[in-house]
Each structure stands twice: as structure tokens, then as C-alpha cells.
Design a protein with these regions (language model features):
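Alpha-helix boundary/interfacial micro-motifs
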Residues: 133, 199-200
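Short linker/helix segments within small regulatory modules
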Residues: 131-147, 168-170, 179
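Short Cys/His-centered divalent metal-binding micro-motifs
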Residues: 143-169
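Extracellular structured ligand-interaction cores
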Residues: 109-114, 146-150, 176
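Amphipathic alpha-helical interaction surfaces
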Residues: 95, 120-124, 155-159
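Nuclease and nuclease-like effector domains acting on nucleic acids or nucleotide cofactors
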Residues: 1-109, 162-169, 173-199
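Histidine-centered nuclease catalytic patch
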Residues: 104-142
Length: 200
């Protein structure tokens, strides 16, 4: 059975930031592709996020990058309500089996949803601030530090939807900072492996 350490104070989150950065550097093939695509888009002389739906399209690219991660994090609430009471699901997670997020966590009929720990609008603003023809290294740095997807309860999401990244937050800081302010706790040692399907 999984022991459930929970990160719920600033000292633990600060030390966790180092581990976060290490894990974030381990990108998969889809994420590497999205770095190339987003760099190419930003380098186009005619690119303008204000034209048509391009702002939405651009933020969707960022969301696809983040959602392409192999593992998603889990909130304390989601673990206690959805995973812990379901021995079959718990065994699948313990066995590191790839899961269909829609089957267990995503959809209008589910009490949980998939939440981006750093809002795509924050990441988009940072990327756009790089100007025309940004370096791939600068784009990669922002994307690598743009957080992860967390499985959270809808009740927890109501707290998060009212929150922004903390004042003076930077991409060099832990992407858990918004969760600290909202009081939403993440289970430290649980990672849910995603199958090939991305839900947005």
C-alpha cells in the first residue's frame, strides 16, 4: 500500500522545487516536438496572437506541451476520494500502468478534472515577452518550468480558479506556489502514468 506523504508547508515545497526542476528536464518526444513547434511559431514574422483565434491556438499549444508529460500529479483530495477507495485503480497506479484519464479522472460526470499548475496564460505571456525570433533555449527554459498537470477535485479547482501565481513569482520558482496559496495539497509520492491520449 502506498504511504501518503503530503506537501503542505513552505519549507517542504521549497526543497521540492529542486526535485521538480530535475524531473522537468526529463522530456519525452512529444514535449521536445512542442518546444520546436512553439519556437517556430514565435519566430514567424507574421505571427500575431491578436489576430483571429491565434491567442487561443497558441495557448492550446502550450497546454498540449504540458499535457504531454508521461506522469500527472495527484491532489490529496483526489487521492482520498477517488484512488484510495478503489483498490483496482490503486493497484494499477502502484504497478505504474498507463491509464486512460477519461476513464478515471476526466469528464463532466467525474468529480475531478485535469488542472494546469501554471496557467497557460502566464506561460503564454512569458513566451510572447521573448519577442520575435527567440532562442530555442529561452523557449525551452520557460516551457520546462511551466509546471505539470495535477488531478484535482472540482471542489479544489474552485479554490485554484480564484488564484493567480503569487506576486513576484518567476519561472525559476516552484510551480507549486499557486497551490500553496490556495491551500490545495499534492501527494508527494504519487504519480499517475498517462496513456497516449491527451484530454484538454
Amino acid at each position: 500500500m502506498i504511504d501518503i506523504p503530503v506537501l503542505d508547508n513552505e519549507e517542504m515545497w521549497a526543497s521540492k522545487a529542486v526535485d521538480d526542476h530535475h524531473k522537468m528536464t526529463q522530456l519525452n518526444v512529444p514535449q521536445l516536438m512542442w518546444i520546436d513547434v512553439i519556437t517556430a511559431v514565435l519566430s514567424q514574422p507574421t505571427f500575431d496572437e491578436k489576430i483571429g483565434n491565434m491567442g487561443y491556438v497558441f495557448k492550446n499549444m502550450i497546454a498540449k506541451y504540458v499535457s504531454s508529460a508521461e506522469y500527472y500529479l495527484v491532489s490529496y483530495g483526489a487521492f482520498n476520494e477517488l484512488i484510495k477507495p478503489n483498490p483496482v485503480l490503486l493497484r494499477l497506479i502502484e504497478a505504474d500502468e498507463p491509464l486512460d484519464m477519461k476513464k478515471y479522472f476526466y469528464g463532466k460526470d467525474k468529480p475531478s478534472l485535469l488542472e494546469h499548475m501554471v496557467r497557460t496564460s502566464v506561460t503564454a505571456k512569458a513566451l510572447l515577452s521573448l519577442g520575435k525570433s527567440p532562442s530555442k533555449e529561452d523557449v525551452s527554459y520557460i516551457l520546462r518550468n511551466s509546471g505539470n498537470v495535477a488531478i484535482v477535485l472540482r471542489e479544489e479547482d474552485k479554490l485554484l480558479s480564484k488564484s493567480k501565481m503569487p506576486k513576484n513569482w518567476a519561472f525559476s520558482d516552484s510551480y507549486h506556489a499557486r497551490y500553496i496559496e490556495a491551500g490545495v495539497k499534492i501527494v508527494e509520492n504519487i504519480r499517475v502514468r498517462r496513456n497516449g491520449t491527451i484530454y484538454r
